[in-house]
UniProtKB/Swiss-Prot annotation:
Location of the protein in the cell: Cytoplasm
Source organism phylogeny: Archaea, Methanobacteriati, Methanobacteriota, Methanomada group, Methanococci
Protein name: Peptide chain release factor subunit 1
Organism encoding this protein: Methanococcus maripaludis (strain DSM 14266 / JCM 13030 / NBRC 101832 / S2 / LL)
Gene Ontology CC terms: cytoplasm
Principal location: cytoplasm
Role according to the record: Directs the termination of nascent peptide synthesis (translation) in response to the termination codons UAA, UAG and UGA.
Length: 419
């Protein structure tokens, strides 16, 4: 059950981050995007033409590296089975490890989370990763408009991310104590200023949301704020008529800006139950409800306890934060082949490698070496699959995810039964 979208998305984001950090010595890194359903023989033929043309490159070193990268990609294409429902993305090239002469061929084959639509062949000093950014964008977007007499906030909720697009202030004056014609004149001025403010909000909302609507990604609009201003804004013709059709509901709020958006999401939780942000929030709240029980309920937390219970098959749902930063390392003896598995903080891997050089095998005294390194979330995903456990990778951009990261070192769980 662990092979879920949150784990796949985390690993895809991690690969993207690594790829963006790669840089070639010259324009010799190859990026190939193969569209879904495209015949691999057509792609191979195109690459062979590029291989032939690369002989015209003036620099012998660059020519050799480009040709090596194309040949590696051709070899990888032979290993793929058709049809490719999602397509495939391949990166290859010589990446320097240090000074001149330290270059090493690196190749990455990615299965995209969504179908590749367009064929791309690019040779550059960097891998071409721009299309990958589109894959990690959540397709369902909710627009948010918070409005009161004095200010307004326009934003979006996309997956786990809240983005404030625009903050506006009205300049509408407060009430004055005046009588007769002065009172009526001031009232007209205030009403006109309020009307103009609503017009501005509508214009910015149209500018912000119409492009998303045209891409068919706008799931709906949520309006909120204190008082009656939001209702007036919703009922009158301040919004583009196509956006008015997307209004889901209006909500009474105490705040505007980001606090207001979070308050609105709480109040709209039943409507938004399916979006990632609410799923995450509800799951973590479920964990905390167990935690505060007198006997700790069905909660577990911390690396040691969670790993123990997971290997026992006692965990129903495992919660891990994206920033956990741990690598699962398999250490092996070069003499007797005894192995050990340990968790190492990713930013301390160099220190661990240096310390390992001075350690001897506990069985035969032989030298120890690192046999395998694996991202802890990928390792946990495999374990969860074995034990029918749900693995949810949560963002630390949310308040709840940040709590799991800070208080429980990025790892918490809900048990199947009391231990």
């Amino acid at each position: 059950m662990s092979g879920n979208s949150s784990t796949d998305l985390y690993l895809f984001k991690k690969s993207l981050k690594e790829l963006k950090g790669k840089k070639g010595k010259g324009t010799e890194l190859i990026s190939v995007y193969v569209p879904a359903g495209r015949r691999l023989s057509d792609i191979s033929q195109y690459l062979r033409q590029e291989l032939s043309q690369s002989s015209n490159i003036k620099s012998k070193t660059t020519m050799k590296n480009v040709q090596s990268a194309i040949e590696v990609i051709l070899q990888r294409l032979k290993l793929l089975k058709e049809p490719l429902e999602m397509g495939v993305i391949i990166f290859a090239g010589m990446i320097p490890r240090g000074g001149p002469g330290t270059e090493k061929m690196e190749v990455y084959v990615l299965e995209p989370p969504e179908p590749v639509k367009t064929f791309v062949y690019r040779c550059d000093s960097l891998f071409y990763t721009d299309p990958l950014e589109d894959f990690i964008q959540d397709n369902e977007v909710y627009g948010v408009i918070l409005v009161d007499r004095n200010e307004a906030t326009i934003g979006t909720v996309r997956g786990k991310t809240i983005t404030i697009l625009k903050k506006l202030t009205s300049g509408v004056p407060g009430k004055f104590k005046a009588g007769g014609q002065s009172a009526r004149r001031l009232e007209r001025l205030i009403d006109d200023a309020a009307h103009q403010f609503m017009v501005r909000i509508g214009e910015y909302a149209t500018e912000s949301f119409m492009p998303i609507l045209e891409e068919k990604k706008l799931k709906g609009l949520l309006l909120g704020g204190p008082g009656n201003t939001k209702n007036e804004f919703a009922e009158k013709d301040y919004l583009h008529h196509e956006l008015k059709k997307k209004i889901i509901d209006t909500f009474d709020l105490c705040y505007t800006e980001e606090f207001g958006i979070r308050e609105l999401l709480d109040k709209a939780s039943d409507l938004l139950r399916d979006i990632d942000l609410m799923k995450e929030k509800n799951l973590i709240q479920r964990f905390f409800k167990e935690l505060i029980k007198d006997d700790g309920g069905l909660s577990a937390y911390g690396e040691a306890q969670v790993m123990k219970y997971l290997e026992m098959g006692a965990i129903d749902t495992l919660i891990v934060t994206e920033d956990i930063g741990i690598t699962r390392v398999t250490v092996k003896c070069n003499n007797c082949d005894i192995t050990q598995e340990v968790n190492v903080k990713t930013n301390e891997m160099f220190k661990f490698e240096e310390q390992l050089k001075t350690k001897a095998c506990p069985t035969c005294g032989g030298a120890m070496y690192i046999d395998e390194e694996k991202d802890i979330i990928e390792y946990l995903s495999d374990l969860c699959n074995m034990h029918n456990t749900d693995l949810i990778v949560v963002s630390t951009d949310t308040e709840e995810g940040s709590q799991i990261s800070r208080a429980f070192k990025g790892m918490a769980a809900i048990l199947r039964y009391k231990l």
